[in-house]
A protein has these predicted regions:
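Extreme N-terminal tail/first-helix region
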Residues: 1-17, 84
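Generic signal for short, ordered secondary-structure residues
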Residues: 4-5, 37, 68, 72
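Covalent nucleotidyltransferase core used to form phosphodiester bonds in nucleic acids
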Residues: 6-8, 43-56
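Short, solvent-exposed coil/turn segments
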Residues: 11-13, 28, 59, 108
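Short beta-strand segments
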Residues: 13-47, 64
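Short, structured beta-strand-loop surface elements
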Residues: 49-118
Length: 118
């Protein structure tokens, strides 16, 4: 699917579905997640940080499929571990969802994921 079609599906979405490949099973595994957009990049924060299962799966196989409002897009994820970069992603989430929500749902923001949409 074209990037512009998928981006249109993101405009009014507060949550998307990601699909990753299981590191042990090799099966496709899907999860609902919050996201933040910045230009042609989409950012994800794993709820339990680096202990989150879907994040561990991306470490082995960085291919990720995103789905929003009936539109899908498949690309490679970039894992962010630099404290400053992760902090910038946390700020994007605070701007979108509110500081209280981010604090409640993301107690261990030690990693983030960058997904190029172009």
């Amino acid at each position: 699917m074209a990037h512009t079609d998928f981006s249109t599906g993101l405009q009014s979405a507060s949550e998307i579905e990601i699909t990753v490949t299981g590191r042990r099973s090799g099966r496709s595994l899907s999860y609902p997640v919050w996201f933040a957009l910045d230009g042609d990049k989409l950012y994800l924060l794993p709820v339990r940080g680096s202990d989150t299962e879907w994040y561990k799966n991306l470490r082995k196989t960085p291919t990720i499929r995103l789905a929003a409002r009936g539109k899908t897009f498949t690309t490679s994820a970039r894992l962010l571990t630099d404290e400053e970069q992760v902090g910038e992603v946390v700020e994007k989430f605070r701007d979108k969802y509110g500081a209280g929500q981010v604090k409640a749902y993301y107690p261990k923001p030690d990693v983030a994921v960058e997904v190029p949409l172009a």
